[in-house]
From Swiss-Prot:
Domain of life, per lineage: Bacteria
Name this polypeptide is given: ATP-dependent Clp protease proteolytic subunit
Pfam families for this protein: CLP_protease
Keyword Protease: yes
Assembly with partners or alone: Fourteen ClpP subunits assemble into 2 heptameric rings which stack back to back to give a disk-like structure with a central cavity, resembling the structure of eukaryotic proteasomes.
NCBIfam families in the cross-refs: clpP, PRK00277.1, PRK12553.1
Record lineage: Bacteria, Pseudomonadati, Pseudomonadota, Gammaproteobacteria, Pseudomonadales
InterPro entries: ClpP, ClpP/crotonase-like_dom_sf, ClpP/TepA, ClpP_His_AS, ClpP_Ser_AS
GO cellular component: cytoplasm; endopeptidase Clp complex
């Protein structure tokens, strides 16, 4: 855990310009300091913040696998605030979410765009949420390639294959038809919290945390 915490801390320090709060806990062995993300990891909370890229994806996947090993029957909570990013990096997170035994509850805070929206929709059924002022956006995958005509054709076919795969999975998770998804992702399609719930991207909009009775 300490090694994972160190890696996570360094990543988030870079992303936040060096400002990561530390939490001091008292125990029988004395005081112990955690960065805030490592402390939340103990509560089975993972933060996915910023562009989706390979390094982030490896960290998220590692944390999902670690929490599964800790308790395979307890939910994991993935908080998303991301503009999107790499399709392959995002798919590695998605596949890990589907692979592990615990349900992964997804919660959008701020924004979940492109691959961020896809991962939001990929959470466990009935456990996909967002806060009331969050924004979601879906669109088709973007790609650009320069080179010989034959290579451009190869990459164009790959992008079309990826688009069909993403649209099919999004249709599965939202309950929309494939034709509807294909139409709605032709251009950037922004959604409010309420619209995302109607569309099936999430299951509910959360205004207040429900406290146990």
């Amino acid at each position: 855990m300490s090694r994972n915490s160190y890696i996570q801390q360094n990543s988030d320090i870079q992303a936040a310009g060096g400002l990561v709060p530390m939490v001091i806990e008292q125990s029988a062995r004395g005081e112990r300091a955690y960065d805030i993300y490592s402390r939340l990891l103990k509560e089975r909370v993972i933060f996915m913040v910023g562009p989706v890229e390979d390094y982030m994806a490896n960290l998220i996947a590692a944390q999902l696998l670690f929490l599964e090993a800790e308790n395979p029957d307890k939910d994991i909570h993935l908080y998303i605030n991301s503009p999107g990013g790499s399709v392959t990096a995002g798919m590695s997170i998605y596949d890990t979410m589907q692979f592990i035994k615990p349900d992964v509850s997804t919660i959008c805070i701020g924004q979940a765009c492109s691959m961020g929206a896809f991962l939001l929709a990929g959470g466990a059924e009935g456990k996909r949420h967002c806060l009331p002022n969050s924004r979601m956006m879906i669109h088709q995958p973007l790609g650009g390639f320069q080179g010989q005509a034959s290579d451009i054709d190869i990459h164009a076919k790959e992008i079309l294959h990826i688009r069909h795969r993403l649209n099919s999975l999004l249709a599965h998770h939202t309950g929309q038809s494939l034709e509807t998804i294909e139409r709605d992702t032709e251009r950037d399609n922004f959604m409010s919290a309420e619209r995302a719930a109607e569309y099936g991207l999430i299951d509910s909009v959360i205004n207040k945390r429900q406290m146990p009775a």
